[in-house]
């Protein structure tokens, strides 16, 4: 799916790649859509678990966001194909259903973390989509540069602790209320 996208996925192609009969796939999945949804839910839950490892919604905003960045970066750098797959899902008709069925504590913990940070005066109040875009898009772009092995200028790029710390510090500064 990562290589050919959803349109390029057929049960026959998948069966051939797995060296099994297409009928075998239908024992486990009702349809192509069911296969995509089940794999997507599994992958989403793995990413949620990786992000939440050692995370507590009671952490300070600074500590909690840094922790999430490091967990997410570690997961995506270890699993670049999964990251690409999840990006495909995020912009597909399957995403809403995946989130609904994943039914994870992830969203609740993220919402609690943001609410706590706002209550403590550590984070400006923003619509969740604006917060999420500012808080995590820079990390995802850095990970993509790393996976591609090149930065925006075409020169070699490798994501390291220093780059993560620089970027997350700027993000935190931008999301804190003026004092």
Predicted regions mapped to residue ranges:
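Helix-turn-helix
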Residues: 2-34, 38
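Short coil/turn segments at alpha/beta junctions that flank glycine-rich nucleotide-binding fingerprints
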Residues: 3-7, 58, 79, 120
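Short, structured helix-loop boundary elements
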Residues: 11, 33, 37, 62, ...
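Generic detection of well-ordered alpha-helical segments
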Residues: 33, 37, 41, 45, ...
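Hydrophobic alpha-helical connector segments
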Residues: 38, 52-78, 131-135
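Amphipathic alpha-helical packing segments from all-alpha helical-bundle domains
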Residues: 45-52, 78, 94-120, 129-134, ...
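C-terminal peripheral helix-coil segments that are non-catalytic and often amphipathic
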Residues: 74, 108, 112-120, 137, ...
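Amphipathic alpha-helical segments used for helix-helix packing
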Residues: 76-95, 144-150
């Amino acid at each position: 799916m990562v290589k050919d996208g959803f349109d390029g996925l057929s049960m026959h192609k998948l069966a051939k790649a797995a060296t099994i009969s297409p009928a075998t796939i239908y024992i486990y999945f009702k349809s192509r859509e069911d296969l995509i949804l089940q794999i997507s839910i599994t992958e989403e839950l793995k990413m949620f678990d990786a992000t939440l490892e050692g995370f507590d919604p009671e952490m300070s905003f600074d500590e909690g966001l840094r922790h999430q960045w490091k967990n997410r970066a570690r997961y995506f750098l270890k699993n670049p194909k999964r990251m690409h797959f999840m990006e495909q899902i995020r912009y597909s008709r399957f995403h809403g259903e995946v989130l609904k069925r994943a039914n994870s504590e992830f969203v609740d913990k993220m919402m609690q973390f943001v609410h706590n940070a706002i209550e403590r005066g550590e984070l400006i109040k923003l619509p969740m989509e604006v917060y999420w875009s500012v808080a995590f898009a820079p990390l995802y772009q850095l990970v993509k540069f790393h996976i591609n092995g090149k930065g925006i200028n075409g020169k070699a790029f490798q994501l390291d602790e220093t780059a993560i710390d620089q970027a997350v510090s700027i993000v935190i500064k931008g999301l804190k209320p003026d004092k």
